[in-house]
């Protein structure tokens, strides 16, 4: 599968792109000839990512929950590269975990929703006008298996990812005739930096539900993402791809 089938090198914005899944995806797309713009709140990690990926990688310190900052960063990418072909929303936080719903802190719940849900909408609304003018675009939102099935002790995260799946269904239908596809991906546990801060009991709880009895890898995620955002993936929209080792079969 080759994303360079477009007339010119595709330009991809990747939120949460300085580390974890976002960076793994960026590495793969760059190898395939894409130009990438990484949005992240960690400036030090952004600079490191830019050095490793090389020029002409674009980086911007952005809180995706900040609508104004997102808009400015997207316009800077469009000015730098002349187009935006791909949007991959990887930025996300788990919030507090291993807590029952009646004990959930509302401030933390709202913070997770702002980043995980509003963040996807903020970038989508800033990028899609560019895609509409081009009559082409690929949007991929990162959901989670917890958004499909719910993980006990993770109310904020599970709720936010269920919302992302719902958003994807709506957007897929709304833009189906425009040349823009909008899809989501729902991984189970993937070994990334975010899981190093989760309690071991929570990781075991999630891994035990996977029939393959293992975590997924960043390379496995990057491989399927490459296809979803490619020109070849032209007849699938509003869909949530699973990457769950057999945990979800629907």
Question: Language-model features: where?
Answer:
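Catalytic Tyr-X3-Lys loop
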Residues: 102-121, 136, 140, 164, ...
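Residue(s) in the substrate-gating loop at a strand-loop-helix junction
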Residues: 144
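Substrate-binding pocket helix/loop in short-chain dehydrogenase/reductase
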Residues: 98-101, 105-110, 195, 206
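The beta1-alpha1 cofactor-binding region of Rossmann-like NAD(H)/NADP(H)-dependent oxidoreductases
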Residues: 43-44, 62-73, 106, 219-220
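Short C-terminal tail/terminal secondary-structure segment
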Residues: 2-4, 98, 149, 226, ...
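Alpha-helical segment proximal to the catalytic Tyr-Lys
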Residues: 129, 173-177, 234
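Canonical Rossmann dinucleotide-binding motif of NAD(H)/NADP(H)-dependent dehydrogenases/reductases
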Residues: 2-36
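Active-site helix of classical SDR
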Residues: 124, 160, 168
